[in-house]
């Protein structure tokens, strides 16, 4: 009986051993957040939980926010410049922009970090606003779970 429990207990730990081979990855994108708004970057605002995540994880200190909102999301999810992703500006409703000027259609040929991580055996999930165009959605772009708004409202 003790031997059976020992073997069963040991086998139960095998998945945990493999799970530790891959680190957890959490990417946080916050609109309108300045680099010095967080305590871990010298900000005055007390952010202990985010500071702890930064201390025990990787802080990206060389990221350039190329544009607001949608283009930055596309940039972060694909590693491409916003115009390469098809999201070079916010939307096509501005009257001064030439007709047919692309910029608010996420290019489905671009590989997302979620697709790469999913193929590597990670479970991928996203929460929040997608805001990457009307024809795309997170489930079709590599996220296995999604809870949030597709638009930017």
Language-model features: where?
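Sec-dependent N-terminal signal peptides
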Residues: 3-15
